[in-house]
Every structure is written in C-alpha cells, then in structure tokens.
C-alpha cells in the first residue's frame, strides 16, 4: 500500500504532465490557472496545494517532463555501431512527431528572462546525463565517451531543431556528418584496439 507521501508525489507528477501538455497545446501566455485546473480535472485550489505559485508549477513541470522526453529519446539510442544508421534515420522524425510541441514550449520557457537560470541548471543536468550515457556506451561500441558525448550533443541538437522548425536541410546535413563521423571513429578505435592501443 502506498504512503500518503507516495500518493502525493504520484499525483503531483500526474499534474505536472497534464499541465505541461496543456501549455504545449495552448501556449504559455494564453493559458491561465483555470485552463490548467480543467486539464487536470481538479480545482485551482487543488493545484495550489501542490505548487506554491504558477512559476513553481511551470519550472517543476518543465524540468520533470523534459527529463521524461530525454529518457524516451535515450531508450531508443543504439548500443551497437551497426544500429547507428537506423537510429539516425528514424529518431529525428519520431521525436518531432512525439515531442515537437514539448521542445517548443521548453525553449519558450527556458529562454524567458524569468526562467533562464532554471534553463541553465536544466542543461547542466542534460550535459551530465548525456556524459553518463556516453560512458555506458563506450564499452559497447568501442568509441571513447569523450568522443561519443559531443556526437550525442550534435545529434540531439539537430533532432530538436528539426522537431521545432521541420528544417529538413539542416537535419540531413547534420545526420550525414554524424553517420560518417561514427563510421570513422569506429574504424579508428577498432584499429587502435587491434594494434594494442598504440595508434593515435
């Protein structure tokens, strides 16, 4: 049986997701507390029992929901170099369809002067999480995490840009460089391994 705190936290997560979805559908400026409460199926007072104010709701909902987007994204990431081409071809379109509105809202919030410090903090966390992911990938694909991490950043940036603006040219040029880069790095580090790690 769940404790009261667990129930509270579960309900809060549910509210954050529904509020973020409501903002993503209707825009940040045109959405008031009544619309949020309606989307959550609760009263305005009930929302305020979970969040001190609208700013706290926006900040916490954005961080929570965008971490979930990251998790969705990274679950699809390849663990084998042979799978990279499929990943690079499919994921930008998948994430644009599934997360495009969320990316647009995230940038609207995190570039707002009121919330920019929270945006900086969120992206520091993104850097740490992607670096940790790259470290887990290193033994699986044979490329050092210090090389994988910037490749992840390039890929994610291109996907987010496409999800927001549907700029096919930008996406395809970035993806082509990534595919070639991964192939070159995989060959380089495989040959280093075969030569006892002496090759630079």
Model-derived regions: residue spans:
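Hydrophobic alpha-helical segments that form the core
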Residues: 143-165, 173-184
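N-terminal intrinsically disordered/low-complexity leader segments
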Residues: 1-10, 193-200
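Short, basic, alpha-helical segments at the C-terminal edge of helix-turn-helix-like DNA-binding modules
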Residues: 62-70
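Amphipathic alpha-helical packing segments from all-alpha helical-bundle domains
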Residues: 114-142, 146-150, 176
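Short alpha-helical scaffolding segments that buttress acidic/His motifs in well-ordered protein cores
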Residues: 92, 106-110, 152-159
């Amino acid at each position: 049986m769940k404790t009261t705190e667990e129930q509270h936290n579960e309900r809060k997560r549910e509210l954050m997701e529904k509020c973020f979805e409501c903002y993503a559908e209707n825009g940040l400026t045109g959405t008031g507390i009544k619309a949020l409460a309606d989307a959550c199926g609760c009263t305005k007072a009930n929302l305020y029992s979970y969040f001190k104010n609208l700013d706290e709701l926006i900040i916490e909902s954005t961080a929570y929901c965008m971490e979930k987007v990251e998790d969705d994204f990274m679950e699809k990431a390849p663990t084998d170099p042979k799978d990279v081409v499929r990943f690079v071809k499919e994921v930008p379109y998948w994430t644009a369809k599934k997360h495009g509105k969320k990316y647009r809202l995230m940038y609207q919030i995190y570039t707002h002067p009121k919330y920019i410090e929270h945006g900086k903090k969120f992206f520091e966390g993104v850097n740490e999480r992607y670096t940790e992911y790259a470290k887990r990938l290193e033994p699986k694909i044979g490329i050092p995490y210090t090389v994988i991490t910037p490749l992840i950043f390039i890929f994610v940036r291109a996907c987010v840009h496409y999800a927001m603006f549907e700029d096919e040219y930008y996406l395809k040029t970035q993806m082509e460089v990534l595919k070639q880069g991964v192939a070159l790095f995989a060959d380089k580090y495989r040959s280093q391994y075969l030569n006892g790690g002496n090759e630079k």
